[in-house]
């Protein structure tokens, strides 16, 4: 979807960028200093937002000099705010873009505002998402904002900081690892300290009255780190700016699960009409079941008896799905794929199926995982479905095998588990800790 990383020349420095295919308008994601354009388009947490944004324009990511894949700079020669803004010009010129929408996140607002004020003819619109003018000002913020810098320094490179500032973002070890990798490729821990000191001194209040482009200021109502007062000040200082407060606690408006209201505001602001955003991603528990030794049994029983047994098996499975409010997605010969909106009910349904089919003289295996699924009509897809299938493939006769993600969601339910160790799941990155249900 996105181009390979390419380079634009900003003075003597090369600025790395990636772009999606051309669209109706160009939308530049103005980065703060701790992102990496090589990684950010691939983050699992932002795929829904990216798909929506690329439906209304070409999305362009780039890295400021001294960060990510752009040229490094010495600690005593850090780029100025003006040079950061010039990076936008360099990328635009390289792409042949005459006018762009600027989408600026938190501290990136400073360079975006300077560009918009100095290059109004090349700025179609300015969007500030959890932006601020000067971080050291007294906005009446709570104690959480004071802890952000310290947390960033101590957690950098682990990915955990992203969960601290985005507490509503779905989280597991794979998501953490994806953010950790981006942090490590963005800047080093030593550079974090230098950049924090630099950006803490930025103040663009004086610039904002000179911003004469359409401006949309979006802010989450319960962001404890960059409070709504910071966003309101931006809207107050920019002539005719529109301020919209949205529900949510995340610092990033482009991550799950709250990106949709933000995107709808952006789409309406840019296109003049409200975008319809399909709620095509849901958190669900997926259950895979299949009959153990089905090929051998089919050969021994013959077609007629085997099909009769399959019909009886299918009736048992569907009865239990109805009992535990599961949704049948598909069948494949001797197996079922179903989804549940409750993880405990999914496990208990798998146990009930396992126990009930024994009266038919057969054994089943079951694998379960909880994760975000893509809804495609009556079908589902996404990495969570692949994980569930791989977990099921590792289950033995009469096993109900679950991922650690699912096990963690049912602690306190009375269900007991047997540790089955860590495993590589084919086609899925990382190691996965699996557990077998050990309850009667």
Report residues per predicted region.
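Helix-rich cap/lid subdomain of alpha/beta-hydrolase
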Residues: 129-197
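Post-His helix in hydrolase/transferase enzymes
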Residues: 230, 252-268
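Catalytic beta-strand-to-alpha-helix segment of the class III nucleotidyl cyclase homology domain
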Residues: 337-440
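Catalytic NTP-binding/metal-coordinating core of nucleotidyl cyclase/transferase enzymes
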Residues: 273-351, 355-356
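Conserved hydrolase catalytic core segment
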Residues: 98-138
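Conserved acidic catalytic loop of the alpha/beta-hydrolase fold
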Residues: 82-100
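Conserved HGGG/HGGXW glycine-rich cap/lid loop of the alpha/beta-hydrolase fold
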Residues: 7-71
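Short beta-strand/loop motif that positions the catalytic acidic residue
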Residues: 211, 217-219
